[in-house]
Curated annotation (Swiss-Prot):
Signal peptide location: none
Subcellular location: Cell inner membrane
Topology of the protein relative to the lipid bilayer: Peripheral membrane protein
Broad class of where this protein is predominantly found: membrane
Phylogenetic placement of the source organism: Bacteria, Thermotogati, Thermotogota, Thermotogae, Thermotogales
Domain of life: Bacteria
Quaternary state and interactors: F-type ATPases have 2 components, CF(1) - the catalytic core - and CF(0) - the membrane proton channel. CF(1) has five subunits: alpha(3), beta(3), gamma(1), delta(1), epsilon(1). CF(0) has three main subunits: a(1), b(2) and c(9-12). The alpha and beta chains form an alternating ring which encloses part of the gamma chain. CF(1) is attached to CF(0) by a central stalk formed by the gamma and epsilon chains, while a peripheral stalk is formed by the delta and b chains.
Recorded family membership: Belongs to the ATPase alpha/beta chains family.
Keyword annotations of the record: ATP synthesis, ATP-binding, Cell inner membrane, Cell membrane, CF(1), Hydrogen ion transport, Ion transport, Membrane, Nucleotide-binding, Translocase, Transport
Recorded name of the encoding gene: atpA
InterPro entries recorded: ATP_synth_asu-like_sf, ATP_synth_asu_C, ATP_synth_asu_C_sf, ATP_synth_F1_a_nt-bd_dom, ATP_synth_F1_asu, ATPase_a/bsu_AS, ATPase_F1/V1/A1_a/bsu_N, ATPase_F1/V1/A1_a/bsu_N_sf
Catalytic activities: ATP + H2O + 4 H(+)(in) = ADP + phosphate + 5 H(+)(out)
Protein name: ATP synthase subunit alpha
Length: 503
């Protein structure tokens, strides 16, 4: 058998021509230092700020946080203990996205959207980046629809509208979370989807909250995002942004959403920790210079969209914890200046048995008044004035021995109104019930009752209204105002009930 050298050459040439090596170019870097939830990486020259990266050997994700001359500071989203010096890091060329949509309702997830409740995987069809630019003025419309909390003191005097940002502020153990949870429970049947973001809390406390939401049937329209105290600071830092993205999905599809951030003090501490580890220069209270921007870019995403964009809304209820009533500290003043009002809870009132312990004098709602229903406006205007006068006279009355009848009458009414504003936890009240009860208080129908009988009067009066005068309640709910005819009927109903009420 003869071998033809020409044929061999031809075959080799064809093989060489058809050979095509696919060169896969990837921007990678090497870990030069790792610890405390951050990694320093050499290389990754083209990486962008906030870009997602992957540690190839472990599969853990990270985010480019600091871009320096000779290295990149990366915050690790998850367990960093398996990452070693020399490991490879590659760019993913996208920013963090979280799953969003109806599939997350009723679920407990971490800030990356991974389930924590043992109910199996979440098959979400939609994803959203956790950081987006807040919509501009042109894309918004004024807040005009109420978000009923079911809490008498708030819905009457510090009303919240859909698309508003209302801060809940106070010392530890004064009932801040209780107000937020009651508000979520009260959204049942209101078409509002809720996101509860727990930042830096004990797992036992979070488990208790989830259990209460389930018990009152609120979990079916709520997503709980958890970055507990035992989670890395990196997850606590991204948690509120992830929760906001989940809420935005509903807002941008023409629906209403409510996001509770519990709480932003711990969020600021987590961000301070990351910034100090990254050697960013510390400022006041050792917080970095951009701590204001951290919260403003989050809370500016609360929005009431105009009709062209579907008219949806995202309402934010951030919570901030104060130390010894100091609302002039750094983080509280920052968040007060960003939000549209604050609900201030006071330990003194809490321990005196006034619960919810809302200081009505220091609390304010800057845009919610426009969203309040007319019926509530009609009765609540009087309530705020009566209580303001009562607060002034109360201190004076402690020292004065003899009071004129007018002053005594104002103090008597003020005491009964304060008693009327007390409310049990987990028992939000429909707005029509609030209107009739407050009407009875401000029109003086409780003045001749002993203070200790006010709560019982309220309970029995509402039962009486449902049994005998349901039409009045229906009328207020449907018309959203107290017409002269309804007012007359209500006065007669109160007098009818007072005739049979036994003190």
């Amino acid at each position: 058998m003869r071998i033809n050298p020409g044929e061999i050459t031809k075959v080799l040439e064809e093989k060489i021509k058809s050979f095509e090596e696919k060169i896969d170019l990837e921007d990678t870097g090497k870990v030069i230092q790792v610890g405390d939830g951050i990694a320093r990486v050499y290389g990754l020259n083209k990486v962008m700020v906030s870009e997602l990266v992957e540690f190839v050997e472990t599969g853990v994700k990270g985010v480019a946080f600091n871009l320096e001359e000779d290295n990149v500071g990366i915050i690790v989203l998850g367990e960093y203990k398996d990452i070693k010096e020399g490991h490879t890091v590659r760019r993913l060329k996208r920013i963090i996205e979280v799953p969003v949509g109806e599939e997350l309702l009723g679920r407990v997830v971490n800030p990356l959207g991974e389930p924590l409740d043992g109910k199996g995987p979440i098959n979400a069809k939609n994803f959203r980046p956790i950081e987006i630019k807040a919509p501009g003025v042109i894309y918004r419309k004024p807040v005009d629809t109420p978000l009923q909390t079911g809490i008498k003191a708030i819905d009457s005097m510090i009303p919240i509208g859909r698309g508003q940002r209302e801060l809940i502020i106070g010392d530890r153990q004064t009932g801040k979370t209780a107000i937020a949870i009651d508000t979520i429970i009260n959204q049942k049947g209101q078409g509002v989807y809720c996101i509860y973001v727990a930042i830096g809390q004990k797992k036992s406390a979070i488990a208790r909250i989830i259990d209460k939401l389930r018990q009152y049937g609120a979990l079916e329209y709520t997503t709980v995002v958890v970055a507990s105290a035992s989670d890395p600071a990196t997850l606590q830092y991204i948690a509120p942004y992830a929760g906001c993205a989940m809420g935005e999905y509903f807002a941008y599809s023409g629906r209403d959403a409510l996001v509770v951030y519990d709480d932003l003090s711990k969020h600021a501490v987590a961000y301070r920790q990351l910034s100090l580890l990254m050697r960013r220069p510390p400022g006041r209270e050792a917080y970095p210079g951009d701590i204001f921007y951290l919260h403003s870019r989050l809370l500016e995403r609360a929005v009431r969209l105009n009709d062209k964009l579907g008219g949806g809304s995202l309402t934010a209820l951030p919570i901030v914890e104060t130390q010894a009533n100091d609302i002039s500290a750094y983080i509280p003043t920052n968040v007060i200046s960003i939000t549209d009002g604050q609900i201030y809870l006071e330990p003194g009132l809490f321990y005196a048995g006034q619960r919810p312990a809302i200081n009505v004098g220091l609390s304010v709602s800057r845009v919610g008044g426009a969203a309040q229903i007319k019926a509530m406006k009609q009765v609540a205007g009087m309530l705020r004035i009566e209580l303001a006068q009562y607060r002034e006279l109360e201190t004076f009355a402690q020292f004065a021995t003899e009071l004129d009848p007018a002053t005594r009458a104002q103090i008597v009414r003020g005491q009964r109104l304060m008693e009327l504003l007390k409310q049990e936890q987990y028992s939000p009240m429909p707005v029509e019930e609030q209107v009739v009860v407050i009407f009875a208080g401000v029109r003086g129908y409780l003045d001749d009752l002993p203070v200790e009988a006010v709560r019982r009067f309220e309970k029995e009066f509402l039962r009486f209204m449902h049994e005998k005068h349901q039409d009045i309640l229906d009328d207020i709910r449907e018309k959203k105002e107290l017409t002269p005819e309804t007012e007359e009927k209500l006065k007669k109903a109160i007098e009818e009930f007072k005739a049979v009420f036994r003190v």
